[in-house]
């Protein structure tokens, strides 16, 4: 009886332990030790071992599939078609779409760009511990040495406008290699400068050369990652320009403690030289052909299409009732377009994914009339498309039509017919104007050399200034305002640390002053890594809840914590120095400051890139322009402000400025979606292009 009972228990145990949900080759007994099975522990181990082996096998297979892309013609651009300067020297192939790179390769490119982005800010701060030595050797004043720092910062802010434009015309790789090769040469000049005037001039050129990555770097990250993964990787990239001002005084103090001040410049020569080699060998071209003007226009059009779905459906029904009459007008417009194509040949599709859709000097070969006609007919096509989908289609080439809505079919049909007639009339007038201005010839056979030189000069030097029009877009202007104010406080803090700790009652040597930047460097690093993940999580959560990606989702509790911490950190730092507290206590303020600054700057940078589809590098260039102007101002006014107001009250004023500026984040959070849906961003893009 006992044996039978035992067999019955075992049978029951087997029945309870079988897992029919597993595949046949993975079915195992998996029971608790209390069940009394002598093989349960062994089976648990076998099950876990099988799972681990399966996971490892899948991981290896996934990695092999990722690496196989490097040799696949489906992903890789042929060697003879690769873009950029010296593409044959790059060991990493160019992909047809930069977002198809394996994850580890994307990370490597991001960290390479982050390393490059350290060059500019490091060149500024590395001479902080050497200011007194430079003053002594050149027999000049501290103010003149500060001028060399200020002009460096100004050029670091102004020149990204041109570098970002060059990167969109010639590609990222060409821009990086050219700029850092120039930086290498100018750093040699700075190390050999015979007097303060030449030193100031060469420092300005160094700032201009190192400025490329300050704007193009964010564009490179946008090339590689979709919006949901962009915040985290932008934070990795932004470690470079934000950690450099904090780490470079440490390097500078170590160098000045052992060698003369010129060693700081020779250190920059070595660093920039290594960077040129790394960029040449490891950086492929990442500028996406998929981000052409046509693709960007499609994205913006889709945004506007989503705004008024219900009304659009009603209007489409009304338009259908009046189809016979309106088709006649549309056919007349289409006939004009056909005649134009017969006259000048086939016009490239504006939605082409070819990189040549970007403007370049080659497009200015005397075919100005043809280009103008292409623009007119492209705008006309877009207007017709908008009229078919939405009654609010307002075109750049036509007189603005009052936005009238009606549920009366006859009135709606009349409004649409009138709008289309205006479009037809304006189109005919503009075509006649272009043809008459060119004497009936669209493509003159010969173009003067002077005109070609002027066109090239315009594209590379004048046209980048048009990017200032982006400041007309409220989300861009507001985000840049807060980002610039936050960034300028970094230089107020850095200059104050060097100024106050080198004087009584502290009297620190340059080596120890450099080490004082460690607390905020640590919190910078922490906030950069986890802050980027935080903003990506917020964006994904918003998409899961509402089904769309909204840049405003990046501004949430992450920014609230930093806005609260920011003024507190400045007050602790300023008043502890003012009251001559123990040297450690002001560093509590700098540590908290590092977290607050990085969290806000990182979130606003991600927001800025997401707000300008396909123009992230240009947006970041504008951001750099404004923030570096304020940073240069901080360099010039910090010492007089500390002497005139006292450290405590000076940083109290800064705390209130930051607190007041944070109100723009509330405005962005509340009204960002309204501007995104109602502002015609495509018109702004057309104005810049």
From Swiss-Prot:
Could you list the residue ranges that cross the membrane? 109-131, 140-163, 176-193, 236-256, 266-283, 476-493, 511-532, 559-577, 587-609, 625-642, 649-668
Classify the main location: membrane
- Write out the biased-composition intervals (Basic and acidic residues): 29-51, 59-73
SUPFAM superfamilies recorded: MFS general substrate transporter
Entry's localization field: Cell membrane
Question: What is a biological process (GO) this protein takes part in?
Answer: intracellular polyamine homeostasis
Q: Which residues carry this modification: Phosphoserine?
A: 436
Side Extracellular, residues: 1-108, 164-175, 257-265, 494-510, 578-586, 643-648
Q: How does the record say this protein sits in the membrane? A: Multi-pass membrane protein
Cytoplasmic compartment ranges equal 132-139, 194-235, 284-475, 533-558, 610-624, 669-689
Q: Per the record, where are the segments of Polar residues compositional bias?
A: 1-24
Signal peptide positions (record):
none
Q: Which InterPro entries match?
A: MFS, MFS_dom, MFS_trans_sf
**Keyword annotations from UniProtKB, A to Z:** Cell membrane, Membrane, Phosphoprotein, Transmembrane, Transmembrane helix, Transport
A GO cellular component entry from the record: cell periphery
The ranges of region (Disordered) come to 1-73
- Biological role stated in the UniProt entry: Multidrug resistance transporter involved in resistance and adaptation to quinidine and to the herbicide barban (4-chloro-2-butynyl [3-chlorophenyl] carbamate).
Q: What is this protein called?
A: Quinidine resistance protein 3
